[in-house]
Amino acid sequence: MIYKVLYQKDKIVNPRRETTQTLYMEADNMVEARTMVEDNTPYNIELIQELTGNSLTYEKEHADFKLTKFDKK
């Protein structure tokens, strides 16, 4: 499954919508997606959203869509 992860670059600064960034990743489930991001980055995760069907198609066509790869631990 493909997940869209909204995050802040670090956990120290309070989250602001204007500085929210996005990454796309593949994982078996939402828990695994969160674990992989937390284990491999200093990011403050705001939201993880599963992308399927029309949502996935839209993101591929209209966003800077690139899958980020993390090592599973």
UniProtKB/Swiss-Prot annotation:
Keywords: DNA-directed RNA polymerase, Nucleotidyltransferase, Transcription, Transferase
An example molecular function term from Gene Ontology annotations: DNA-directed RNA polymerase activity
The family this protein is said to belong to: Belongs to the RNA polymerase subunit epsilon family.
Subunit architecture: RNAP is composed of a core of 2 alpha, a beta and a beta' subunit. The core is associated with a delta subunit, and at least one of epsilon or omega. When a sigma factor is associated with the core the holoenzyme is formed, which can initiate transcription.
Keyword tRNA-binding: no
Protein's name according to its UniProt entry: DNA-directed RNA polymerase subunit epsilon
Catalytic activity field: RNA(n) + a ribonucleoside 5'-triphosphate = RNA(n+1) + diphosphate
Recorded superkingdom: Bacteria
InterPro entries in the record: RpoY
GO biological process, one term: DNA-templated transcription
